C-alpha cells in the first residue's frame, strides 16, 4: 500500500513539475510570472518538496540539461463532427502528434482546423464572503467595475460571483 501511495504522489509531482517547467519558460521569477506563481502554489498544496519545485523552475528556465517540455495545441474533429481543442505538455512533439492522431482515428476522427469556431474566454469566480472580508470594495461597486472593464456575462449564484469575458 505504501508503494501505491508513493506511485500516486510521484505522478502528481511529475504533473506539477511539468506545469512549473512550462510556466518558468516565460520567466523564472514567480513574483513577476503569475502562471509560475500559480503552478508553484498548486505544487505546494500537494506537498511537493521544495527541491523538486526549484529543479523544475531551473529546467524550464533552461539552466538544466534534458528535454524541454513544451505546450502544444492540436485541433481535431471527432465523432459526429464534434470539435476539439487539445492542449498538451510534451517533451517530444513527434510522438505526441502521432499519439493524438491515433487517438482521434480510433473514434473515427482526425486532426483538422477548428479553432476558428471557438472564442477564447476567461472566467473569474469570486466568493462574496471573500470580497466582503477584504473590505476593498462593496459588491455593487465591484460589479460596476467589472462591467466597465468589459465583462460580457455576470452571474450571481449561491454567494458566488461569476464573470465571463472575451480575451482578444
Regions found by a protein language model. Name each.
Residues 1-29:
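Intrinsically disordered, Lys/Arg-rich N-terminal extensions and targeting peptides
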Residues 78-82, 91-94, 118-120, 157-159:
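Short flexible coil/turn linkers enriched for glycine and charged/polar residues
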Residues 84, 116-132, 161:
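Short glycine-/aliphatic-rich beta-strand segments at the starts of folded cytosolic domains
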Residues 104-111, 148-153:
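A common structural junction motif
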Residues 9-12, 16, 32-36, 49, ...:
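Helical mechanochemical/support elements of P-loop NTPase systems and associated helical scaffolds
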Residues 89-93, 125-137, 165-168:
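Short, surface-exposed ligand-recognition loops at beta-strand->loop->(often short) alpha-helix junctions
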Residues 32-85:
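Translation machinery proteins
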Residues 20, 47, 53, 100, ...:
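Residue-level signature of catalytic and energy-coupling elements of molecular machines
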Amino acid at each position: 500500500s505504501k508503494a501505491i501511495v508513493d506511485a500516486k504522489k510521484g505522478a502528481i509531482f511529475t504533473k506539477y513539475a511539468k506545469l512549473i517547467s512550462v510556466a518558468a519558460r516565460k520567466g523564472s521569477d514567480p513574483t513577476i510570472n503569475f502562471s509560475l506563481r500559480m503552478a508553484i502554489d498548486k505544487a505546494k498544496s500537494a506537498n511537493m518538496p521544495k527541491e523538486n519545485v526549484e529543479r523544475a523552475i531551473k529546467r524550464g528556465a533552461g539552466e538544466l540539461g534534458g528535454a524541454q517540455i513544451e505546450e502544444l495545441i492540436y485541433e481535431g474533429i471527432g465523432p459526429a463532427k464534434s470539435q476539439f481543442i487539445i492542449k498538451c505538455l510534451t517533451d517530444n512533439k513527434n510522438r505526441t502528434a502521432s499519439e493524438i492522431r491515433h487517438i482521434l482515428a480510433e473514434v473515427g476522427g482526425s486532426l483538422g482546423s477548428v479553432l476558428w469556431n471557438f472564442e477564447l474566454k476567461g472566467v473569474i469566480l469570486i466568493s462574496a464572503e471573500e470580497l466582503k472580508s477584504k473590505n476593498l470594495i462593496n459588491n455593487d461597486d465591484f460589479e460596476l467595475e467589472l462591467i466597465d472593464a468589459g465583462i460580457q456575462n455576470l452571474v450571481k449564484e449561491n454567494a458566488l460571483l461569476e464573470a465571463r469575458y472575451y480575451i482578444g
